[in-house]
Amino acid sequence: MQLKRSKRRSSVSPGVGGSLAAATCALLGPGTAPQVVAQELEPWVIDSAALYYAESDGRVSDFSVSTWARKEKGEDRFLTLTLTFDTLTGASPNGAVPQPLPQTFTRASGNDDFTIAAGGAPLDDTFQDTRTALSASWDLPVSRLSKVNVGVSYSDEFDYTHTGVNFGFARDFNNRNTTVSLGAAIASDSWNPLGGIPTALAPMREVGNYDSKCCGGGRGERDKDVTDLLVGITQVLNRDSIIQFNYSLSKSDGYLTDPFKILSVVDPVTGILAPGPVGSGLGLYLYENRPGEREKQSFYTLYKRNLGGNVFDISYRYMTDDWEIDSHTVDLHYRFNMGEGGKYLQPHIRFYSQTAADFYRTALFDGAPVPQFVSADYRLGEFDAFTIGIEYGQDTRRGAIDARLELYQQSGTADSWAAVGALANYNLYPDLNAVIAQFSYKFGR
């Protein structure tokens, strides 16, 4: 869950998955009822939110503001616009392992370096980035029992750009008690980092030496394309409960490597960092390399029930991919409605667990063959995560407000074989703790 430079890029672009999810949710509302008299169109409904995310030990923090606006443009025809701006700062892990001696790393630009104290976690503490994201969607009925949603999305960062389109279709059956939905999304994303894209598995070089970069220190660009497909069914079980099932398929092609991640090459007995290229004054660090294709399949189910005026929901998601990552997510909410004024209190618990990618390595041993694909990015490693939180909301004269606070904890498992020599004295997969706070205000309803 860590929010850092590549939080949106480690797998499927969120513009794709997020747009597809939004389109699908928009289509799962009530079916289009027949109109027999003219009705007044709904005014603009605007929902604005501010979110703060902060990791422990001075690591990454994120401050985000977003606005969601929806306007009925005709009978059951809605235009939805979103704008998000966020800024990230802090210390970002680069994939190297701790050492009993100070370590020096060349920054991604190739124009500067930084040093980590002996025994310290290899973090680049000058990381910062900003992101602006825009999206628009259009919902409209195509018959009495069906409707469609079409949308576009765009986001821009200093070194990364996303563009995407999405489409959704939903059809009601069984006296509107059953809804079948289909969705598709396509995105094209581009990396364009300062200093150029590193050559996969090349050694890190000293400041001003671009031999390890594919573009000689220029702003080389690499692209990836992502396609998402979704099919789902939502069933009303009785007046108090509904259930939903979704299957989604995601395919990514192109540059799926993180150009900012490296691996340490250490002595297989002492665990001490091997010397880097002659004259560089650095240890031996190799830039990671991931496969150029990835296919993910997800199975999702949600059960929601009204319990005497309160609402309980539980969902489960299983994801598997051809990188050999399998994940399980269980999400639970219980909304206590507190009478007049729309007041409610909603506790939230989330459990997450995943296995490691087949090419994940905590480090590499000097003298051993280097795999074709390898990464020390701990987001690709084996870990478990737990989130607990609470949300409060109430109506206002012109809308509604809500606030939530969540605590996140993540613990992982490094490769046991990597704890050799000096490395046995360090935690090669440190725990991660984070706090999430959000406030939102909705008006115009």
Model-predicted regions and their roles:
Residues 1-42, 201-213, 445:
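Cleavable N-terminal export/targeting peptides
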Residues 40-46, 75-83, 132, 144-148, ...:
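Outer-envelope beta-barrel architecture signal
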Residues 45-51, 82-84, 139, 149-153, ...:
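Transmembrane beta-strands of outer-membrane beta-barrel proteins
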Residues 50-54, 85-89, 152-158, 171-173, ...:
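Transmembrane beta-strands of outer-membrane beta-barrel pores
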Residues 54-62, 126-130, 154-164, 291-294, ...:
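Solvent-exposed loop/turn segments connecting transmembrane beta-strands
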Residues 59-63, 82, 92-98, 153-155, ...:
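Outer-membrane beta-barrel translocator domains and adjoining extracellular loop/strand segments
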Residues 82-134, 179-240, 250-253, 344-394, ...:
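Outer-membrane beta-barrel translocator/channel fold
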Residues 169, 431-445:
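Outer-membrane beta-barrel "beta-signal"
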